[in-house]
């Protein structure tokens, strides 16, 4: 049964895309706590989505590490909250 989490990152990327600002990450994880879908929403509006069909792009990739549920236990969200974010379009420039 998938579980869903939302995590605010208060640090910027520290790479050539640092100007995107801070971000909010959303995770759907499997029974072993590995991400199966992941969304990154940046302060500038940029949205990155990763899953098994799109595991990486020029900006990042689907995490290959299991989430530490001790660290994420207070960050669980409902499936519909995750799905709403997953379906949001990329803002137009």
Place the predicted regions along the sequence by residue.
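Short helix/strand-capping turn motifs
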Residues: 9-17, 25-52
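Acidic, low-complexity, intrinsically disordered interaction modules
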Residues: 46-60, 66
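Short, hydrophobic/aromatic-rich segments at coil-to-beta transitions
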Residues: 1-4, 24
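Short, compact, well-ordered microdomains
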Residues: 60-93
């Amino acid at each position: 049964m998938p579980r869903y989490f939302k995590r605010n990152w208060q640090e910027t990327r520290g790479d050539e895309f640092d100007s995107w600002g801070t971000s909010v990450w959303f995770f759907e994880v499997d029974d072993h706590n590995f991400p199966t879908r992941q969304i990154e929403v940046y302060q500038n509006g940029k949205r990155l989505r990763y899953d098994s069909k799109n595991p990486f792009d020029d900006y990042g990739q689907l995490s290959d590490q299991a989430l530490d549920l001790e660290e994420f236990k207070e960050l669980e969200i409902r499936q519909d909250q995750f799905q709403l974010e997953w379906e949001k379009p990329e803002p137009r420039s």
